[in-house]
Amino acid sequence: MPTTNQLVVNGRENKVRKQNAPALNLSFNTLTKSARKLPAPFKRGVCTRVATMTPKKPNSASRKYARVKLSNGMEITAYIGGEGHNLQEHSVVLIRGGRVKDLPGVRYHIVRGTQDLAGVANRKQGRSLYGAKKEKK
């Protein structure tokens, strides 16, 4: 335990917190060719690969994911939620934060119903996260 005098002279050092979604914090300036800190809730990117992955134990499935080259130059792995999708290579997508617990290295989600990714078809409840429009009566 430090003495009061030691604290006055040196002070306490703040803990550095690790970012959960670091790609959302950087923005790339094309004129100066430099990255700078500019946090954003979403980022746009282009799919470079669309594939499936098996989750960690004890789960079993084939989870859909996409490798995305973001507008800030970073390449990330993002999860495609919902049943069925129309993504292909070179599709433009919108990325939000949020990891997938049973897929190692997947720290982002792709937003459904925006850019080139359609919403989930025939979804009646919990439509907001899946980009599904309200059904007409």
From Swiss-Prot:
GO molecular function: rRNA binding; structural constituent of ribosome; tRNA binding
Subunit structure comment from the entry: Part of the 30S ribosomal subunit. Contacts proteins S8 and S17. May interact with IF1 in the 30S initiation complex.
Keywords: Methylation, Ribonucleoprotein, Ribosomal protein, RNA-binding, rRNA-binding, tRNA-binding
InterPro entries, A to Z: NA-bd_OB-fold (IPR012340), Ribosomal_uS12 (IPR006032), Ribosomal_uS12_bac (IPR005679)
NCBIfam families: rpsL_bact
Domain of life: Bacteria
An annotated GO BP: translation
Keyword Metal-binding attributed: no
Pfam families, A to Z: Ribosom_S12_S23
Family that this chain belongs to: Belongs to the universal ribosomal protein uS12 family.
GO cellular component: small ribosomal subunit
Native species: Mycoplasmopsis agalactiae (strain NCTC 10123 / CIP 59.7 / PG2)
Protein name: Small ribosomal subunit protein uS12
PROSITE patterns, alphabetized: RIBOSOMAL_S12 (PS00055)
Phylogenetic classification of the source organism: Bacteria, Bacillati, Mycoplasmatota, Mycoplasmoidales, Metamycoplasmataceae
Functional summary from the UniProt entry: With S4 and S5 plays an important role in translational accuracy.
Keyword Transmembrane helix: no
Transmembrane segments: none
PTM annotation (3-methylthioaspartic acid): residues: 102
